[in-house]
């Protein structure tokens, strides 16, 4: 999936937060946006994953204007790890990660096995496999963030947006 942002501008209460941000990301590319606290990094990501609408400019996914793509379709292609998560689930680490597979869960036993395999591999990739049966609420803040990252990985998105993971 290719992402292109052209001249993104956004203001809050008359204060310009984003001023002409342009960016292109092609398949299999990795980009980092750096800047001091409060410079608009999170706000920019929110425009990409449609929490905030820019005042000016356009965002394209695979050459199509984001506004012309259903929220459901764009959500199927994007996974987000937010700066702060508000998950308050009293369940296991594995259960939280399996939430990333929920849209894909199948009724056939063989396909369920594949969903669990994807979840196990995601947990291994973030170093949380050994804690898969622990309560999510018992984890430290950093461990919770790694679990949320694993959940995003299980979605197998074409675009993964990470806000200070």
What is each of the regions a protein language model found here?
Residues 34-36:
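The feature captures the beta-strand-to-loop junction immediately N-terminal to the Walker
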Residues 57-65, 74:
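Conserved ABC transporter NBD signature motif
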Residues 98, 113-131:
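Conserved ABC ATPase "signature" region
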Residues 156:
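Conserved catalytic motifs of ABC-family nucleotide-binding domains
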Residues 160-164:
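Catalytic Walker B motif of ABC-type/P-loop ATPase nucleotide-binding domains
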């Amino acid at each position: 999936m290719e992402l292109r942002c052209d001249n993104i501008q956004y203001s809050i209460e008359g204060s310009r937060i984003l001023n002409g941000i342009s960016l292109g990301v092609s398949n299999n590319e990795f980009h980092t946006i750096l800047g001091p606290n409060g410079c608009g990094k999170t706000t920019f990501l929110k425009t990409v994953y449609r929490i905030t609408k820019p005042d000016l400019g356009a965002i394209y996914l695979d050459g199509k204007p984001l506004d012309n793509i259903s929220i459901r379709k764009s959500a199927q292609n994007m996974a987000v790890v937010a700066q702060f998560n508000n998950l308050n689930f009293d369940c296991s680490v594995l259960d939280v990660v399996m939430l990333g597979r929920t849209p894909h869960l199948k009724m056939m036993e063989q396909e369920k096995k594949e969903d669990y395999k994807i979840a196990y591999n995601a947990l291994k990739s973030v170093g949380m496999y050994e804690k898969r049966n622990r309560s999510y609420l018992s984890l430290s803040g950093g461990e919770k963030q790694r679990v949320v990252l694993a959940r995003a990985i299980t979605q197998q998105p074409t675009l993964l947006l990470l806000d200070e993971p």
